[in-house]
Amino acid sequence: MDVLHRLAEILEQRKTEAPDKSYAASLYAKGLDTILKKIGEEATETVIAAKDGEPGKIVYEMADLWFHCCVLLAQQGLGPDDVLRELGRRFGMSGLEEKASRKLG
C-alpha cells in the first residue's frame, strides 16, 4: 500500500481518537476553519521555500501541505483516490480543454 493510502487510513482512524492523543485528531476537533488555516499556512511556507530555491525545504514544506490537504479530504469524507481520479480524468487534456470543460458542467 502506498504512503498516501496508508495516511488516509490513519487519518480516518484519528477522527475517533481523543484530541489530546493525536495532532490530526486535534485538528478534527477544532474544525474546518482550523484545517483550512493550516493549509493556508503550509501553502505559504511552500511558496517561500520555492522562492528561496531550496529543494530540501520545498519537499519538506510540500509534505506538510499534502498532509494537511489529506486531513481536509478525510474531514470532508474524501480521500486520495478522489483526487487521483480527477487527475486521471485530466491527464492528456490540455489546460485550455480542462478549463473549458469546467464551464460545461
From Swiss-Prot:
Enzyme Commission number: 3.6.1.31
Full protein name: Phosphoribosyl-ATP pyrophosphatase
Keyword flag Amino-acid biosynthesis: yes
CDD domains noted in UniProt: NTP-PPase_HisIE_like
Disulfide bonding pattern of the chain: none
Origin superkingdom: Bacteria
Example of a GO MF term: phosphoribosyl-ATP diphosphatase activity
Pathway(s) served: Amino-acid biosynthesis; L-histidine biosynthesis; L-histidine from 5-phospho-alpha-D-ribose 1-diphosphate: step 2/9
Family per similarity comment: Belongs to the PRA-PH family.
A Gene Ontology BP annotation from the UniProt entry: L-histidine biosynthetic process
Major subcellular site: cytoplasm
Localisation: Cytoplasm
Annotated source species: Methylococcus capsulatus (strain ATCC 33009 / NCIMB 11132 / Bath)
NCBIfam families named in the record: histidine_hisI, PRK00400.1-3
Class of the enzyme per the UniProt entry, highest EC level: hydrolase
A Pfam cross-reference name: PRA-PH
Keyword Nucleotidyltransferase: no
Alphabetically ordered keywords of this record: Amino-acid biosynthesis, ATP-binding, Cytoplasm, Histidine biosynthesis, Hydrolase, Nucleotide-binding
Catalytic reaction(s) noted: 1-(5-phospho-beta-D-ribosyl)-ATP + H2O = 1-(5-phospho-beta-D-ribosyl)-5'-AMP + diphosphate + H(+)
